[in-house]
Amino acid sequence: LTDTVALSDAVQWAVDNVDLEETLILVTADHSHTMTISGYPRRGNPILGTVETEPGKPLLDATGAPYTTLSYANGPGYKKQRPNLSTIDTKAPDYQQLGTVPMPAETHAGEDVAAFAAGQNAGAVRGVMEQNRLYDVMYDVLIND
């Protein structure tokens, strides 16, 4: 999650240091990953914690065990038998989120990725778009400058 914080800081720096009437800031990715947020954590639930309906009250899965907010479809966090998370500090720096399929590393996924824009021509970035359309949005800014 430190990369997410660094990206947020970089985007904020750009917003604070450019003229948005003359500049397009476009943030996107070329792929997604298999990390997901699982089933109904309350607003404000610790992102690295177990899912809770209210503070101190974990939501339990079909086997009666708590589960983490974040998990991976694959990766090094696979465990042959899922550990009892009620006795594990999932927010500890050395805790590794669970993965469903054993892999040496987590892989890319295939869903659409978000694109966020601010500034000149940002209104052209909306809804579901083909990735190559983002080039046209950037090109329009360049030729209409």
Regions found by a protein language model. Give the residues of each.
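A post-motif C-terminal structural segment
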Residues: 1-145
